[in-house]
Amino acid sequence: VTTTYDWVQQGTVRAELEAAEARTLAPWAARSARSAGRGQPEPEDPVRTCWMRDLDRIIFSRAMMRAHGKTQSFIPAFSGEGPAAGRQGGPYIGDHYVTRATHMQQTARIAATLAQALALNVPLASAIATGHDLGHACFGHGGEAALQQVAPGGFDHARQGARLLTLLEPRNLTAEVLDGIARHSWKHDPPSTLEGMCARLADRIAYLTADLTDALRAGVLAGVADVPAEVRRVLGDNPTDMIGVLVEDVIRHSRGRPHVAQGDACAEVMTTMRSFMFERVYLRPEAERQTERAKRLLTDLYGHYLEHPDTMPMGASLAEDPVEQQAVDAIAGMTDRYALAAWKAAFALHAV
């Protein structure tokens, strides 16, 4: 008698999922049965495809836990300025702001919607999108700018994410997921899969609309009327509408075709919106001051670790690497709160 347990142990569930992919996905979609595999071969999971397994490994990682404490754009540790003004020198954003973790969750949902509508591999798109920003430093743009300045050879959060998941906190992910994470940024060549392109487009849709929401909530923008008229004319008058319009545009211009792309009109207004967000939000004077504070804090901490490598957090880097790389890995893995506490401990101070 064959029991349900026997079916599970024999991999019947996974095999059925792989067969469903072969029947239902577009010819150009990635198929888990054809994955290029993992760095370290291991037995297949009996009930999950390889990319379902990767998604779970990313969600359950320590890096994902820390991502909840990393800034996306607004730095809670420096909050305080704005219509609801506090006293600490930054926009007051309360508890409802986007962190790296919530940004990755939102990106993953958008990527999954795109992949589903385009008959692509949803678990692969979800895994890439869920882990795409794990390599980001604390303090948002300021943290990355600091590490770019001090790290030998510069710092790239996309490459750092792949390094993190391969070497520092190895999850033995598939080649396709690591490729999508390492190449999700628009400054890199496109990822090797269309599912990676879903994650890349979803990232931009998610961060622009979420950062707009945070800017409105913090009072950095007086209202949606501040957004350029041409953007509102195409995308609508609130961030939720904007997400829907942008997602439907990608589907309309990609469905039934071996590519994932936007239409010209939406691509143009996204460029306009991105320029607007840099001018009015990311590079506004207060944001620049916060960025400089973050850069100074992390630059100080980097120098301290070069002089006192024994004070670096244990397990955050590889002992065989040069001390400069160890310091970069240690700092890149920190949450905002941990970095601030480490700086205070290193310099016996209580304010930045």
Set out the residue ranges of the language-model regions.
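Conserved short loop/turn motifs at secondary-structure junctions
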Residues: 131, 148-149, 318
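A glycine- and small-aliphatic-rich helix-loop capping segment at beta-alpha/alpha-beta transitions
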Residues: 140-152
